[in-house]
Amino acid sequence: MSRTVDPIDHLYQMVKDGISYGIVHQVAEDEYHSGRTIRIHDQQLINFGLCSYLGIEADERLKQGVIDAVNQFGVQYSVSRAYVSNRLYTELEDLLGQMFDGKHVLVTQNTTLGHLAALPVIIEPNDAVLVDFQVHNSVQTTLSQLRTKKVHIEYIRNDDMAQLEERIVALQEQHRRIWYLCDGIYSMYGNAASITTLESLLNRYEQFHLYIDDAHGMSWSGKHGRGFVLNQIEQHERMIVVVSLSKSFSAGGGAIVFPNFDLYHKVKSCGGPMIFSIPINPPTLGAAVASAKLHLSDELPALQNQLMANIRYFNQMAEAYQLPLVNATENPIRFIGVGLPKLAYAVVSRLQELGFYTNIAAYPAVPMRRSGIRITVTNHHTKEDILALIQAIAQVLPVLLREGGSSMDKLYKTFKMSNPDSLTMPANEEGRSSSAALKLEHHTSIQEIQSKEWNQLLGGRGFEWDFLHCLERTFENQPLPENNWAFHYYIVRDSNGVPVLATFCTKVLLKDDILESGEVSKAVEQLRVDNPYYLTSNYLVMGSLLTEGDHLYLDRQGNWQEALSMFIEELQAEQARCHANTIMLRDFSIHDEELAEWMKQHGYLSRAMPESNVLILQCEDEQDYVSQLSRSARALIRKEVLAFEHMFEVDIVTCDSPTPSEALIEDLHNLYLNVQRRKHDINLFALPQNLWSEMLKHPGWELLVFRIAPEHGGDPEGRPVGFMSCYKGENHYVMSMVGINSQYTESHHLYRQTFYQSIKRAIQLKLPVVHLGIDANKEKQRFGAATHATNVYYQTSDHYAYQVLDNIKANLGSALAVTR
C-alpha cells in the first residue's frame, strides 16, 4: 500500500464535512445585493463573510462605470493584450499609477494570473526563492514553474525574520538574487508581515528582493488606498507589490506595482497570462476605472476611517467579552479560535441559525487543532451588528466547546494565548468532566504499574512489563537527545476498577520525514550533513521505536469512546507539557472503520504505515516448517539457505551467557549501522551502542550472532558477519534489529540466513507467532509471513515541516522531469 497522502483527499473530505453542516457551497438567494445582509435557505443573515471591506461594491458610480463600458465596448473584448488592449486598460493603469505615486502598474486578469505572469519572468535560474509558509496559495502555484528552471526554493516559517535573515546570509554567495515571497496581510489569521524589518533587510543585503502580495491590504489602508504595505514604507527599488482589484477595490482583476519600467515592460511582454489569456472584460474595467477615481477623490479617507472604527470596535468588544481573538491587529480579517474542525463547523453552523453568516477556517488552511471562525469586517456593518455577533459568539462558543469535550481554558492553551484572569464561564465549563464511571491513570514508569495486570492487558502482544522496564533503563541518561525517551503509560478504569483502555507512549525526537519515501529521506539526509537535527521535532508516539503491533488495549464492549476521549485529552495535555509537535497513534487495522471515523472527528489525519509481517508457525521442526512453504520458496531456501547453513556458526547470546566483550559489542553495533545507514524507508536516528549490552541484562532478549569459518571465506579473526536481536515473549518471538556485513549478502546469502535461523530458533522455543518486522515484504513472504496493513493516525500543531517536505518532494519530481 502506498504511504503517499494526496492532499486533495483531505481537502475534499473537509469540504464534504462543511457541506454536511450546511456552511459551504451555499447559494445566496438575494434579489439584490446590499452588502450588509445575505439570504441563505430563506433566512436573512448579517453578512460577515465579504472581502469588499470599504463597502463600495454597490456604489452607483461603479455601476454606472459598468453600464458605460458595456454601452461603449460590449460585454467582451476577446483578444490577447499582446496584440491590442481596450483603451480602458490604459486609463485604468494611468489612474493606478497616480494612486501608487507614479509607479509603473500592470493590470492583470486577477492576482493568481498576475503571479503566474510575473514570477516565472522576474526570477531567473541562479536565483533563490524563500517562501513564507503561510503565503497565499495563488503565490505557491507558481513554484512548479520555477522548479522547471531549477530555481532553488525553500520555505520560511511565517514571518520569521530571524530565519529569513539567516537564510539570506547562507545563500548569498551561491545565488545572484534572493527573493522572499510573502503576504502583507495573511488571509486566515489576519496577521501582518513585519514590513519595517523587511525594509531593513532590503537596505542591508543588496541581493535581497521582496515580492509581496497585498491583496487584503488594498484600498482600506494608505494614501489613495495604495495598501497596507505601502502605507508602512516607500516602495523599495528591489520590491514588487501585488494588489487585488477584486476585494476592497470592488471591481475585478489584479495589479502589479513595479519599481521601474524595465520590469514592468518585461512582465507585460513575456508573462504567460499576459500573452495567452483573455483580458478583463469591459464591464469590469469600467467598474475598476470608476473605483480608481473614487480612490483618488477626497471621499476615500472618510471610508477608511469608518472601516477602522468598525475594526477597533470589534477588537474592543472581543476583548470585553473575553473571546479568543487570535490576532488583535487592526485590519478587516478577524479570527476567533475554536479548536478542532468539528467544533468550528458547529460554531459557524450555530451562528448561522442565530442570523450571522461567517466563514470557517479549517485544515489544511490552518493547523488541524487551530481551526476557527474567520470574520471580515466591512463598512456595511453597524456597531449594533458587530456587538450582536460578538454576543452570539460569547453565548454559543463555551456551550459548544463543552458539548464537544473542550473548554475555553483548553482553547486558549491550544492557541498559546493567555486566558483572561476575569474569565467566568457557565457551570461545568471546564470541559469534559470525567465520567463518574471512568477514571484515568497516567504513569511515567512501568514500575508504577503491577506487572501481572499489565502483562494480562498487553504482555501477550509483545509489550511485557520486564521488556518495557528494560527499555526505560536503556533510553535514559544518553549523551544524544534522540536516545533519551520519556515513557508514558495510560490506563482508564471503569467504576469497578476494571481496565477499559491501556497503552503506552514515548516522547522521542524523530526525523520529520519518518513516513516519507526513501527517495525523499535521502534528499533530506543531504541537508542534514551540516545540521543532523534539521527537520526533526519531538513526537508523542504510541508504543516505542522498538515495538510493533497493536499497542492499544481497548474493551469495545465497555464505554470505549469515553475512555478513548479521556486518553486523547490527557495525551494532548502531555503534548503541551513536553512541547511535542506531533502525536502519532500507530499500528491500527485499516479495516476498523468505526475507529477511523472517531479519529477523524477528533482531528486526526491518517496514512498507511509500512506493512508488518507475521509468521504463524504450525510445525514440529524446521523440516516440517520448510515443507509447508510454497514450491518456489522451498526451492529458494534449499538452494540459498540450507546449502550454505553448514558454513555458519550461530551463537545464541543471552543474559546467562558470559558478558560480551566491548570489542564484540562494537562489532555488533557497526554491523547494525551498516543496515541502518542504508535504510531510508523508515528514517530513524541510530540507536545507541549500549543497547545491545542492556538487552542482554534481560532474560527475554537474546542475540543470534553469525560467524563464517575462515575456510568458507569468513573473517580470519572470527569476527561476526551478522546478528539478529530477538525478544522471547510468552507465545511470540520478535525479530527486532538486524546487523549485516554486506560483503556476505550475495556470496553467502547472509540476510536470508539470519531470517531462517531466527525462525528456526522460534521453532525450538515452541513460540508459534514470529514477528518479522516491517519492509522487505517479498523476502519475508518467501519465509511464509503474512503482511498486515495498518494505519497511523497523527495530529500536528505546526505543519511547517510537512510544507518543507512537500517542497523537497516537488523539487525531486521536477529534477526527474528535467532529467527525462
Briefly describe each language-model feature range:
Residues 60, 64-68, 72, 94, ...:
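PLP-dependent enzyme catalytic core of the Aspartate aminotransferase-like
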Residues 433-523, 572, 582-746:
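A conserved beta-strand-loop-helix scaffold within acyl/acetyltransferase catalytic domains
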Residues 154-211:
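Active-site phosphate-binding strand-loop segment of PLP-dependent enzymes
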Residues 301-312, 321-354, 365, 377-379:
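Conserved PLP-binding catalytic core of the aspartate aminotransferase-like
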Residues 64-110:
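Conserved N-terminal alpha-helix of the aminotransferase class I/II PLP-enzyme fold
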